[in-house]
Amino acid sequence: MMRKLTCYCSVAALVAGAGFAGNAMADEQRIADLEERLEALEADPATGDGIRFGGALRFNARYDDTDSAGGQASRDSGGDIDFDTFRVNVDGRQDNITFAAEYRWYDGRDFLHTGWVGYDFTDTTTVRLGQQRVAFGLQPYQSNNFWFSGNYYVGFEDKHAIGLALDHQAGPLAIDAGIFTNPPAGLSGDSFHYSTGVGPDSDREDETLAHEEQNQFYARAAYTFDHNESASTEVGLSGMYGELYNNDTRDEGDSTAYALHVNGQYDRWNIMAQYLSYDHDPDVSDGFSDDVLNMSIEGFNYAAPAEADVITFNVAYDLPVEFGPVSNLRFYNDYSTIRQKSTDDRSSALNVTGMAITAGNIYTYVDVIRGKNMPFVGAQGYALQGDSDVRDDWETIFNINVGYYF
């Protein structure tokens, strides 16, 4: 339903969406950091070498109050509690060689989440080859909640792809670059893979739904200003250029995107802001629209604007507590809006107000998810199906996601 991955990837994000898995947000990164320290102690004390195993089991409770068939069914039943995700992961190191792999099972589908091999040239420079998270904009996530932000639904949050990436840390300056030749690996069908992106619909009836991301180059630079021991501000710039392959005509278009972001940590407060602009220029035959592209994720397909601006603003507050196993509460409000460039009257918005609860190995999201013309939040789609479907109504989903990490 979004600061880079280290060589030890014990806790990764879980996918958002209607009826499919949720995501692990910024608080969950803290769990990952703690796991990494524990794993380092368990590894060879002299070299840090070793192999570590982990996983997670998650369940989801949801009450859908949207104006949709799913919303009506949810109201009739008083809500639903369902299996969300089971995953296993392994990562490790042998001298300068590192690796990580993760596989996930959802309800009726499963696929590879992560699978890469890396090499540490120095303590500050690493390369990785394989399926991995793409560094673009706010990292590792552009939201705090279970449902992600609008960036996720247009393919720019928690994005994974297959390619070669380089990370370099020069004091307060972090530089990431990579070339990603293919979308994430899937087992069956064009859209059965982790991570959202432009992809073909296996059941398409026209070439508007035939495009696929290929040979994408990403670059990101971020600088952190340390104000004092408990306050810092990161500012960053990201860019992307890539190809859009038409599986029907075998012609190629192109894609460009850039993002400016600020991520501030001020004692217990965290503020994230980002402006992202992207332009997909697909090559289509006469008579077919180039204003809309098909997005694919975990077997789901939906329409998204070919060109849009995405604005994100999030505020979060951490409250340490001592209440049984509960050690921290994170309160947050995440807001994002997607504005289609080709028309002024089509926009989408997502606002999530919630709380993340840390209790030992259990991590819980309690969210009020409100969407306007957002996929998986109501019946009206993505404000792209024609003027009659563009509505200003906000739809609401109440969601609780509970996960046990081991």
PLM region spans:
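Predominantly the C-terminal beta-signal and adjacent terminal strand-loop region
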Residues: 359-399, 403-405
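Membrane-embedded beta-strands of outer-membrane beta-barrel proteins
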Residues: 86-88, 115, 164-166, 219-221, ...
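Detector for outer-membrane/organellar transmembrane beta-barrel domains
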Residues: 214, 223, 228-341, 349, ...
